[in-house]
Amino acid sequence: MGFVGAIAIGTILLLLPGMTAPGRSTTFVDALFTATSAVTTTGLASVDTATHWTFLGQLAIIVMTQVGGLGILISAALVGVLLARRLSLRTRLNAASEFQAEGFTDLRKLVRAVVGLTLLIEAIVALLLFLRFLIHYGWDVGRAAWNAVFDSISAFANLGFALQTDNMMGFVSDPFVCLPLCAGVILGGLGFPVIVQLWRDWAHPLRWSMNTNLMVTGTIGLLVLGSAYLTFVEWDNPDTFGRLDPPARVLAGFFASTMTRTGGFNSVDLAAMRDESWFASDVLMFIGAGPASVGGGIRVTTFLVLFFIMLAELRGEGNVNIFGKRLSRAVHRQAITIVLISVAVVVAPTLLLLQLTEFPLGRVLFEVISAFSTTGLSTGITPDLPDSAKIVLAVVMLVGRVGPLTLGGALVLRERRILYEFPRERPVVG
């Protein structure tokens, strides 16, 4: 309920006087949609962030993003650490679950490390962007500083909101803007436990957990494959990469691939991309980021777990072994459950939006997967959706942020223990 409460407060804040730019008005649905997008760190926008909101409105959005990025339970744990200096057992367990931690004895150290690393990464990205905006583009100090801070938080939170009306299209060939943003998105999508372990054991890969190994391997592999494919497909598209010089095309491909991993920024017009690129982006967005991260999707680890299960089955192996360790049988069921629920969460809203709007399947599916994976990329149809469709997408964003398995677990409330077994039988599959 923490996310729902934060969204409600954010909606009320965005409806207050002084939040909307002069000459513009904010409806309840647009305020609700924007607050949901910010708290869930999605980045889909029904109004232009740069021109619709005043400085106070933009500040409210980025604060909601920071709160959502850290997680409501994590923020509550942080308050307990800094103020009360004590945590209840229930809070420890809940926060440990949010972090996907193996235990909870070191939770307070973990919370401090996560918050410290978050602020450090955001500060480094903000400093790099600030210097670039100030020196190269000649922006005044106030504008450069505010844009740098906003963009850095938006990047690490995998939000994708920007204070430019064309998002990052004006910086498509500037590596000193694109690469810091990519770094922030990648680090934010790795997952807090992975960041902490990499920070502590970066020089000792043999100490890495299976989760860290999966995330590092999967992130690199998906970035390379996604970049290569999108660059190849869009290379001669005059409306996207075709107008750029070769180095800028490679940079644009890497940027696009990174942002489909729940980043949300765009340096080219997504509506002008080819159908093959849309489909590839759908797949990358659906896979998403890492567990216990600010990103969404089924998670990179889930995708790789299913991949290794498939390999083991093809080889006829009874156990699934990954990086020298045997995969738990319970993880098999969890991975399959996550994917099946996620498919349902995508298919049902897609069918509903096709009834509520006149947009083609390709655009609607892209928008729904973007909402579910909390990516925030859009083909440009979100502002033109009817209020009913915006509410549907808002619900999808919330479900995507909470997580399919977490939602299912919350409905069941507790694990059922069955004290008997039925006879075993093998149906024909495939």
Give the predicted meaning of each segment.
Residues 1-430:
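Membrane-proximal intracellular helices of multi-pass ion channels
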